[in-house]
């Protein structure tokens, strides 16, 4: 009688420790939900957010070597936007979500409107090329962000179908 009870206890212990998992087929194992992964795209996104975008603002700040109140406020608004973007990306990556929700993108777009308004004021009738260069770099950066978001998903979708 005691041997039968010991065999039952040993079988229960084997189930709890996972010793019988080698006999399971993958057909009986539940599929894991797809999750975003930390990759080189995340590192490049952070590098762009923390290096290229502030560099564009620096070009505007050095434009004509004038430190006006409007230029300083615009630079501060731009750096605040970059800081908010970094915080939101870090929070959403920690929660395992996509980098920015539509509401967060709209809020960051409103912060970026101050920079666009400064571009219209500081062009000096087209005599300086620095604001145009900064605008081109910012536009290229936005296109790269969009492509870095869309292309991996399009590639994964084409493989899945």
Swiss-Prot record:
One of its GO terms (biological process) is viral life cycle. It is found in: Virion; Host cell membrane; Host endosome membrane; Host Golgi apparatus membrane. InterPro entries: Herpes_UL20. Its main location: virion. It holds the Pfam family Herpes_UL20. The keyword Transmembrane applies. The chain crosses the membrane at residues 42-62, 69-89, 106-126, 131-151. GO terms for cellular component: host cell endosome membrane; host cell Golgi membrane; host cell nuclear membrane; host cell plasma membrane; membrane; virion component. Plays an essential role in egress of virus particles from the nucleus, cytoplasmic envelopment and virus-induced cell fusion. Forms a functional protein complex with gK and this interaction is absolutely essential for their coordinate intracellular transport, gK glycosylation, expression on host cell surface, and function. Together, they modulate gB-mediated virus-induced cell fusion and virion egress and therefore actively participate in these processes. Belongs to the alphaherpesvirinae UL20 family. This is Protein UL20. It comes from Suid herpesvirus 1 (strain NIA-3) (SuHV-1).
